[in-house]
Amino acid sequence: MNIVILAAGTGKRMRSALPKVLHPLAGRPLLSHVIDTARALAPSRLVVVIGHGAERVRAAVAAPDVQFAVQEQQLGTGHAVRQALPLLDPSQPTLVLYGDVPLTRAATLRRLADAATDARYGVLTVTLDDPTGYGRIVRDQAGCVTRIVEQKDASADELKIAEINTGIVVAPTAQLSMWLGALGNDNAQGEYYLTDVVEQAIEAGFEIVTTQPDDEWETLGVNSKAQLAELERIHQRKLAEALLADGVTLADPARIDVRGKLTCGRDVSIDVNCVFEGDVTLADGVTIGANCVIRNAAIAAGARVDAFSHLDGATLGANTVVGPYARLRPGAVLADDAHVGNFVEVKNATLGHGSKANHLTYLGDADIGARVNVGAGTITCNYDGANKFRTVIEDDVFVGSDTQFVAPVRVGRGVTVAAGTTVWKDVAEGMLVLNDKTQTAKSGYVRPVKKKS
């Protein structure tokens, strides 16, 4: 089967410089969702028709299995499909999809394709309580489809019809090519409508078959930011329902956003207002607190991420505790039972088994061993303005508060670092390291008093 995706429209109502089909739904372009659905049908040819913002669209979705046809002027859906014809296999039927209709299930499209075999032309329709704005399916007394009429060209009686055309069709490619070549543009818009092919198919003796989706929202398109927001909520609701069905506990299914792939084990609990981006894995018994953002992370069994924490490219071992208000950046790796607390940032660093950095700390480009206690206010000074250097802290080190490690530096096993120390040279195993300081107390000091105006 050939699949053609129409993605050339200007999207004026979006009021955006970004091509409509590149606006994100669940963190990915609308068009990417449609391409994924198309791939699930294993097409022999997959062609995307581009026009407005063509090069941006091409760059966003380019892949070895995707071909592109360009519609230089937006002259209607029939004209758009015509641009794809040279790239299609004429011996296979063609399914036409839309880059701004992202939620159609592959199973729905498979049903339509299966119905439109031999000398049949398949149309996906849906019955709406309010069909305003859509092309109507006109049937004769026997229930056979006779034509599809657009809203602007419909009579008063035709406007009362509730069954509408979604625009998604399947047709035999060789005949479709002939029909498209014969299209006219004698209509209110002066465009070449793909829907007008139906009358030609009937005249050629083709039966018009219709199927409907299981859910109305499968056929909803995006023409405005309001519609995009509506589809986002529908999509997120379906994702939340799938998580609940898999046994995940959601404090409020209406307040979770999945913008990628979220894989959960047993007894996972997710509090409100959490966002998951990219590829995220939560193993058995993981607990995620409220208002967390987690991107491209793997979190092992029994771990806990407390509220307002941000994880990006991080790996957490079993029974780790993170947050609240922690930030783990790419390359952060926490071994089993490690703790990273409030206002701690970890970047390109490892924290060994049972090690803890519980308060107000920056650990960047560091290798920290097991059972290390990192005191509040500790900083790894990893950057000289041009180059990054690593700090190595071996097992069983105790780091006092307000300590700076000036990399590159290595601190040996079992070292104790006194509070307020700046470590800029390597420290041998088992040593106490501190900076000599004196404390002066002066009597008779009078603190200045601010004058009142």
UniProtKB/Swiss-Prot annotation:
Keywords linked to the UniProt accession: Acyltransferase, Cell shape, Cell wall biogenesis/degradation, Cytoplasm, Magnesium, Metal-binding, Multifunctional enzyme, Nucleotidyltransferase, Peptidoglycan synthesis, Repeat, Transferase
Region: N-acetyltransferase, residue numbers: 247-453
Matching InterPro entries: Bifunctional_GlmU (IPR005882), GlmU-like (IPR050065), GlmU_C_LbH (IPR038009), Hexapep (IPR001451), MobA-like_NTP_Trfase (IPR025877), Nucleotide-diphossugar_trans (IPR029044), Trimer_LpxA-like_sf (IPR011004)
Annotated residues for binding of Mg(2+): 100, 223
Active site (record annotation): 359
Localization of this protein: Cytoplasm
Protein's UniProt keywords contain Cell membrane: no
Biological or metabolic pathway of the protein: Nucleotide-sugar biosynthesis; UDP-N-acetyl-alpha-D-glucosamine biosynthesis; N-acetyl-alpha-D-glucosamine 1-phosphate from alpha-D-glucosamine 6-phosphate (route II): step 2/2; Nucleotide-sugar biosynthesis; UDP-N-acetyl-alpha-D-glucosamine biosynthesis; UDP-N-acetyl-alpha-D-glucosamine from N-acetyl-alpha-D-glucosamine 1-phosphate: step 1/1; Bacterial outer membrane biogenesis; LPS lipid A biosynthesis
One of the GO BP terms on file: lipid A biosynthetic process
Signal peptide: none
Name the record gives this protein: Bifunctional protein GlmU
Gene this chain is encoded by: glmU
